[in-house]
């Protein structure tokens, strides 16, 4: 009886989803499985990447980074932590969301 009550209780709980409602059309998502995943979202004008990326090495590339993410969806809600010179020219700034940066990179 206790198991049935527990199952009924668990079934009534809301399901949490960390997915973000976002149009990924025209974007390439890359992941390399390492201890922490290496993540890239590439758009037509540049890309955002995880903390593995050094924006100072992005010569003539518009790139920005976010930290502490494990999925592409988390990249969208994370705050941009570093920006290359070319990304700054597109209006991408430290502190904006990953989703805002991706839209400027489309």
Regions found by a protein language model. Give the residues of each.
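Sec/Tat signal peptide C-region and signal peptidase I cleavage site
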Residues: 13-17
């Amino acid at each position: 009886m206790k198991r049935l009550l527990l199952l009924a209780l668990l079934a009534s709980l809301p399901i949490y989803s960390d997915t973000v409602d976002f149009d990924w059309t025209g974007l390439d998502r890359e992941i390399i499985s390492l201890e922490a995943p290496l993540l890239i979202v590439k758009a037509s004008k540049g890309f955002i990447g995880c903390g593995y990326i050094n924006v100072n090495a992005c010569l003539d590339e518009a790139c920005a980074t976010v930290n502490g993410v494990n999925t592409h969806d988390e990249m969208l809600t994370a705050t941009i932590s570093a920006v290359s010179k070319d990304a700054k020219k597109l209006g991408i700034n430290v502190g904006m969301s990953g989703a805002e940066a991706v839209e400027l990179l489309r």
